[in-house]
């Protein structure tokens, strides 16, 4: 019997008799050390109903290649999974023992990855020896290399650089028995942690770039494409959004989320109340219209103040103790002839209780562009001119 073929038959018997210890030793080398659990996973895989026939055919082909004994043939074949991914390559290892060629049964391990988002993840687990992996934020990081089969590994994960930090005890689950061809494998994480995406409804009614998410009342910038997390979440997290219109803040509904139970982000939908925003818009429009009328009335009274050289005509329009008040008290007494005409309002903006009005007016044939700041009291529904600048 060809001795190389005998070594393959010996391996067959080890698999047949579930000799996990011997299989692990045969598959281990200077680069990789396989455990009995790795060997058990391999045996369970090749003995499964779906893979038994393919495994037998591959073993027979390897023995046939040995029988053919082609010159310079150092690789006799491979045991693969159902997608053609190499599991074990059987070849000469270049050594002889009493004129007998030794075979190497070289396992192919698969890299398994984890993905972090706005956090750093530190994983600690046992695989033959203690492992520690630091996964940086917004990166895919290799967790380790694993053989064929399914693994469920007790793991401690520490979340850092996140809104909610902490250490979690859970497990990572890995399934290499049905991974397709050339697919990157990610570990399924079983921890009390959360990560999610957020879609806002009715946000177009508010100002762009005014949105914030509040996660347990800690605000972060909103981005519809962003994944938020991963967050330490032993119980639940509170999430809602705020947005602004003319400085007024609006809030969405609040969602309390629990931990993730699969390897995908949760998809949250938060909605601003359209009726609330429309109601504010309607009331604010009336305020701005009233501000236009107010500034026109003020301009008429300002003309009187200049004509009579008496500040009293505008004293009820100008904010007390403002810089504008000091300035106008001097100006109305000057010898200059001032009479503003052709007042045209070009723009009105609001920010909370400040109304900003841009207008044009003429004086002695010259056109002036003036910007006014009005202070609005939403209780009395009254205005005071706080500042003005001519361009």
Per-segment meaning from a language model:
Residues 103-107, 182-197, 258-287:
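Conserved "repeat-terminator" motif of extracellular CCP/Sushi domains
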Residues 59-149, 158, 170-202, 342-391:
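Exposed beta-sheet edge and beta->alpha loop/turn motif
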Residues 242-244, 248, 289-391:
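Long, low-complexity, Ser/Thr/Pro- and Asp/Glu-rich intrinsically disordered
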Residues 196-205, 209-210, 217, 222, ...:
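Lumenal/extracellular ectodomains and adaptor appendage modules
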Residues 3-19, 23, 281-307:
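Short, aromatic-enriched amphipathic alpha-helices that serve as compact interaction elements
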Residues 24-85, 311-354, 365-366:
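Short solvent-exposed beta->alpha transition segments
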């Amino acid at each position: 019997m060809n001795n190389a073929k005998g070594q393959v038959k010996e391996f067959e018997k080890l698999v047949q008799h579930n000799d996990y210890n011997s299989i692990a030793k045969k598959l281990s080398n200077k680069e990789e050390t396989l455990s009995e659990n790795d060997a058990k996973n391999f045996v369970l895989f090749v003995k499964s109903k779906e893979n038994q026939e393919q495994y037998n055919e591959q073993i027979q082909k390897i023995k046939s290649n040995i029988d053919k004994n082609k010159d310079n043939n150092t690789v006799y074949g491979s045991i693969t999974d159902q997608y053609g991914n190499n599991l074990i390559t059987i070849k000469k290892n270049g050594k002889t023992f009493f004129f007998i060629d030794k075979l190497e049964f070289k396992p192919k391990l698969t890299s398994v990855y984890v993905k972090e988002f706005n956090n750093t993840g530190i994983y600690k687990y046992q695989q033959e020896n203690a492992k520690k992996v630091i996964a940086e934020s917004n990166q895919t990081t290799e967790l380790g290399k694993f053989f064929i089969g399914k693994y469920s590994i007790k793991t401690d994960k520490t979340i850092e650089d996140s809104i909610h930090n902490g250490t979690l005890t859970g497990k990572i689950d890995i399934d290499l028995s049905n991974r397709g061809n050339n697919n990157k494998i990610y570990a399924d994480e079983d921890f009390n942690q959360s990560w999610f995406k957020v879609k806002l409804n009715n946000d177009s009614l508010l100002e762009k770039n005014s949105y914030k998410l509040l996660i347990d009342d800690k605000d972060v910038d909103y981005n519809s494409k962003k994944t938020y997390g991963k967050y330490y979440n032993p119980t639940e997290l509170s999430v809602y959004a705020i947005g602004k219109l003319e400085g007024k803040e609006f809030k969405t509904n609040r969602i309390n989320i629990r931990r993730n139970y699969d390897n995908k982000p949760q998809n949250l939908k938060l909605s601003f109340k359209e009726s609330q925003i429309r109601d504010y818009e309607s009331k604010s429009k009336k305020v701005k219209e009233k501000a236009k009328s107010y500034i026109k009335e003020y301009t008429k009274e300002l003309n009187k103040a200049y004509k009579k050289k008496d500040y009293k005509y505008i004293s009820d329009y100008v904010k007390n103790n403002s810089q504008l008040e000091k300035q106008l008290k001097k100006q109305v007494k000057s010898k200059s002839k001032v009479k503003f005409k052709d007042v045209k309002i070009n723009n009105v903006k609001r920010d909370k209780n400040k109304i900003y009005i841009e207008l044009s007016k003429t004086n002695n044939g010259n056109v002036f562009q003036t910007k006014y700041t009005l202070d609005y009291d939403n209780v009395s529904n009254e205005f005071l001119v706080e500042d003005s600048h001519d361009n």
